[in-house]
């Protein structure tokens, strides 16, 4: 995204605040970030205060569809999975509306492979039942079709990071286990 201190970024899906804090600290950007999660809003609000970043980060508790204004850059990390197939058009129309002319956007999310996509839409699998209830993962081709048909956005770069996901999960698991050991009460 070539972030600079002149950028005002809109982040759709705050998560636990990692991106907003990183961008503010490392690049000096202004970030407006939104979540609909009470727990994440409370956690990130406290984090922003502790880090002294109230002047750089604006935290909203709003649905992304109600956002206004235009921004230099747009980021959405691991949120598109929650949007669902039926709302992808609206999601990208909203992204297009929020970006200034020549603005840049980075979306990172889990997609479904093309070969099984039609069946995926009609079935309930492990991911739809336990990970993202009520949603559907989307396919890259579907995203590209929606962008081309309904927005003025264009694809600049696409990267498949599948090969890194297993390693990421392993690192998360090890970190989780370390935290369990750290927080476990000592034996008596």
Task: Show which residues each predicted segment covers.
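Short, glycine-/aromatic-enriched active-site segment of Class I SAM-dependent methyltransferases
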Residues: 116-133
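Short alpha-helix
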Residues: 136-151
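Conserved small/polar residues in nucleotide/adenosyl-binding loops
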Residues: 182-187
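Conserved class I S-adenosyl-L-methionine
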Residues: 6-13
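Conserved SAM-binding loop of SAM-dependent methyltransferases across substrates and taxa
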Residues: 18-27
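Conserved beta-strand signature within the Rossmann-like core of class I S-adenosyl-L-methionine
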Residues: 102-109
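A short glycine-rich, Lys/Arg-flanked "PGG" loop and its adjoining helix->strand segment in the class I
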Residues: 89-101
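A short acidic, Gly/Pro-enriched loop at the edge of an enzyme's catalytic core
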Residues: 65-74
